[in-house]
A protein has these predicted regions:
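Helix-loop-helix "hairpin" substructures at the membrane interface of multi-pass membrane proteins
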Residues: 200-209, 214, 227, 234-256, ...
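Cytosolic-side transmembrane-helix boundaries in multi-pass membrane proteins
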Residues: 1-26, 216-225, 229, 233-237, ...
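Transmembrane alpha-helical segments in multi-pass inner-membrane proteins
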Residues: 68, 320-326, 330-405
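Single transmembrane alpha-helix segments in multi-pass membrane proteins
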Residues: 26, 39-89, 109-127, 357-366, ...
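Hydrophobic alpha-helical segments embedded in the membrane of multi-pass proteins
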Residues: 48-59, 77, 106-110, 275-276, ...
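Extracellular/periplasmic helix-loop junction at the C-terminal end of a transmembrane helix
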Residues: 138-196, 223-228, 237-260, 387-394
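Alpha-helical transmembrane segments within multi-pass membrane transporters and channels
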Residues: 91-138, 156
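Membrane-interfacial amphipathic/re-entrant helices at transmembrane-helix boundaries
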Residues: 2-56, 92-95, 264
Length: 424
């Protein structure tokens, strides 16, 4: 019996090895950097809100058996184009964000469909294909926005375009600037729409999560006839969150250190709501027939075909949904930054999103919402804290920058090696 328990503990540790390792790295880096708890919490909330949707966009392709979708770069480009156009048309604020999202969605549907069709031609090689497709798309994007805008595509806007003089001495505008600043009303339009102090939000979150937990347990006991233990397990995500929030609420009342850490922390409510809605959309899709088809295709394409599922169509739909969600994620990301680096903002989107997902404990063939948020928190804490820790240790923040690059690509490499090892 003791040996069985020992094996079970080892199995759990092996399964959660990556998140545990990065949790330790985060704690050590925070300690070395000497940054205050309030700074770390504020920066983490900002970065989770900025990046979460991009990482959520990876879930459906993983479920569909296509691995980690590096081609979300195309969705990011679609979102960027929407933001560039609303800046050109001077549609500012939340209406501008909505218009940009609609434009991005349409473009992402087209690009996602083409990507899905390509993936159907290279089954089993989707990840490397998605990565190379991203590089190719970057080249096409640069060609359009450096040379074609203003010359082939009619557009004149001194605010966002480069100018030069022709032989006749006339000012002409060709190509976009490297950096396009959003108008004041568009910068942080979503984040600043509604903010609340964390100390006021915490009790409401606690009551909300507790209520949802009770409803799920009651539904499982009443409708599905499950016992209490199985019902609690079905609601484990909400239950664990409720317990954590409850402990935090107690500490807020009893610990001055915790009060100080959270005293100035603000939460962008609208951003959180949008992230929650996108997560609910993905979860809802997984509960529908389409979601069951996606899971079946991911497990075994031959079995799915025998069951009458249109495998190619299902894979295209999963790719389209991933690309569309990525376009929304890039819009949320860039409004938080306040500008768009026209030719650079999208380049590392896929790599950073994939790395964050893997840090959360996901793999090529399995990804959950819990892993999305665990990975987002851990990866981005390391992302902003390692340069500060490097500066303290070596008086050179550049070493921290090198570690960030090593961290990102190293995670992906190790994950692929472990996946191949398990298959042997």
């Amino acid at each position: 019996m003791g040996k069985k328990k020992q094996n079970k503990v080892l199995e759990i540790l092996q399964g959660y090895m990556v998140p545990i390792l990065f949790t330790l790295l985060c704690l050590v880096s925070i300690k070395i950097s000497g940054q205050s708890a309030s700074y770390v919490i504020t920066e983490t909330i900002s970065r989770v809100g900025r990046n979460a949707i991009l990482i959520v966009s990876l879930i459906l392709p993983v479920m569909c058996g296509m691995g980690l979708n590096f081609s979300i770069v195309l969705g990011a480009m679609a979102g960027e184009i929407g933001l560039i156009l609303i800046t050109h048309w001077s549609i500012d604020g939340l209406p501008g964000i909505i218009v940009a999202s609609l434009i991005g969605t349409v473009l992402a549907i087209v690009l996602g469909t083409l990507t899905g069709m390509l993936f159907n031609k290279v089954k089993g090689q989707e990840m490397i294909t998605g990565m190379i497709l991203g590089f190719f798309a970057v080249g096409v994007y640069d060609l359009i926005f450096i040379f074609m805008v203003g010359s082939v595509i009619p557009m004149v806007n001194p605010e966002i375009m480069l100018n030069s003089q022709n032989a006749a001495g006339e000012t002409i505008y060709v190509g976009l600037r490297n950096t396009i600043d959003f108008h004041a009303a568009t910068k942080y339009a979503v984040d600043n729409a509604c903010k609340m102090m964390f100390v006021k939000l915490l009790p409401m979150m606690l009551v909300g999560f507790a209520a949802v937990t009770v409803l799920i347990v009651a539904f499982n006991i009443g409708k599905k006839k499950l016992d209490v233990k199985k019902s609690l397990f079905a609601a484990r995500g909400f239950l664990i969150t409720t317990i954590i929030l409850g402990i935090l609420q107690i500490l807020m009342k009893t610990s001055k250190a915790v009060q100080k850490a959270f005293f100035i922390v603000q939460v962008p409510i609208l951003t959180v709501v949008i992230i929650a809605l996108v997560c609910m959309l993905v979860v809802f899709i997984t509960k529908t027939k389409l979601g069951q088809d996606i899971k079946t295709v991911g497990m075994n394409m031959q079995v799915a075909t025998a069951a009458g599922i249109n495998v190619d169509k299902t894979r295209i739909v999963a790719t389209v949904l991933s690309t569309v969600i990525a376009s929304w994620g890039q819009i949320i990301f860039l409004q938080n930054i306040g500008n768009v680096q026209t030719f650079n903002s999208h380049e590392q989107v896929g790599t950073y999103a994939v790395a964050a997902l893997l840090v959360g404990g996901a793999s090529i063939d399995k990804a959950t919402m819990g892993q999305v948020f665990t990975g987002t928190v851990l990866f981005h804490i390391l992302f902003f804290i390692t340069p500060l820790a490097g500066k303290v240790l070596f008086s050179d923040p550049q070493l921290g920058e090198y570690f960030r690059v090593f961290l990102c690509y190293g995670i992906i490499a190790v994950s692929l090696i472990l996946y191949a090892w398990k298959k042997i």
